[in-house]
Amino acid sequence: MKTKIKYLRQEMGITQKDLAEKVGVSRQTINALENGKYNPSLLVAYKITQLLNKEHIEEVFVFEDEEI
């Protein structure tokens, strides 16, 4: 999954550490999300979306087509 977290976070002047603390995850988790190495739970995705002042998860997370 690709994300726009890094771009949006930097645009708002928020560090990985600050975002992690507000979401309730580690800084390493935010780093993994930004690098596409971790798929968040729906709750974490929702919290990040709210904290980045977006209304829709799709504005932050780009879901890639996966074969089932």
Q: Where are the predicted features?
A:
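Short, basic-rich loop-to-helix N-cap that marks the start of a DNA-contacting helix
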Residues: 37-50
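Short, charged recognition helix plus adjacent turn
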Residues: 50, 58-68
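Short basic helix-loop element that most often maps to the first helix and adjoining turn
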Residues: 3-22
